[in-house]
Amino acid sequence: MFENLSERLERSLKILKGEGKITEVNVAETLKDVRKALLDADVNYKVAKQFTDTVKEKALGMNVLTSVRPGQLMVKVVHDELAALMGGEAVDIDIKGHPAVILMAGLQGSGKTTFSAKLANLLKTKRAKKPLLAACDVYRPAAIDQLKVLGEQIGVTVYTEPGNNKPVEIALNAIKEARAKGFDVVIIDTAGRLAIDEMMMQEITAIKEAVSPNEILFVVDSMTGQDAVNTAKEFNERLDFSGVILTKLDGDTRGGAALSIRTVVEKPIKFVGTGEKMDAFDVFHPDRMADRILGMGDIVSFVERAQEQFDAEQAKRLQKKMGKGKFDYNDFLEQIGQIKKMGNMKDIMGMIPGVGKAIKDLDINDDAFKGIEAMIYSMTPAERMNPELLDKSQSRRNRIAKGSGQSIQEVSRMIKQFEQTRKMMKNVAGAKLPNLGSMMRR
């Protein structure tokens, strides 16, 4: 995400790397480039100007230690101001109450329904809550069906009232249902609407007044840039929402919405969507996003995702096998499964400091795992447990290629990389994950 902006900012900040000290001249030259990079990233003009003015004031006003180079200082100031621009600190959602009520709002197609299910899944799996999804989009039958499918997928109850076309009534009845059956949180999925559609705006205002929600979350598509910011501003004037959800952030190479929306509407970004899977969204951490924009990675989020998928018993067993050099294809399958659970591979690798830039132009293909898995599943149980059987047997490789639908060259390549991984894992005795990044390239 934000690859174009990251590259431009890195080039801009290089101007100061060869300088001996900070001066008004070299700061002005650097920030001229920074401002242009922000504007090209579709950042609001006033926000970009305010940002560069603040960075200039702080950079020229700091007492610089002789050991700190001007380039390092400017990166520090830009990082801190980027984080401040996006809110400074992560802001949690309010789920107090019996039940807590969360009202979703936004344009049609912004991802409200999918996000409603993702939020329910997070509350269920990570907050030990019992959520209820309320289907209040009475204008689009497919939205109710979609919510039912997603609810079934994550094991969350969906409240519907077939035949009732009054969203306020449905929302109130959903809350009654929650109280009666012990649900902790009610998430109200509403119809998409335009801020200029007076009838629809009156409807969601009526829902707000009727249910007195803990949170009103406004969902916007980050890839629409300044349109997202302008829409959020119009909705906020009518609804006074409590937070913003940015969806489709994984496809946003510019970052204009993420960098502008907090300042323009003065409401925090609470979550960001990074894919279609139910766990493909994150709490928004402004400081970590600033790290990623400046090419520093996001090692904290990387470790958190890894820990979520960590199986202590499996790790102990694997460590013993690796110490004895017994790592086999069954273990390899388990490792692939753990890594797949962490999310989009390019996004995950981009969290590792220094890796984001290196993989920018590579086609990191999540589907490549399917080919590797197909090759392993095409092996006999004996071959999976005894990798050396494949070392010099061309007939076995031919059979695996035919059974998996892969070429013989791909099978040989996978075996070679598996052997390299096995040697590495024996040396580190399970201290690190295998380097599967190269196996994702196509």
Features from the language model and the residues they span:
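Conserved phosphate-handling catalytic cores of large alpha/beta enzymes
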Residues: 171-175, 179, 183, 195, ...
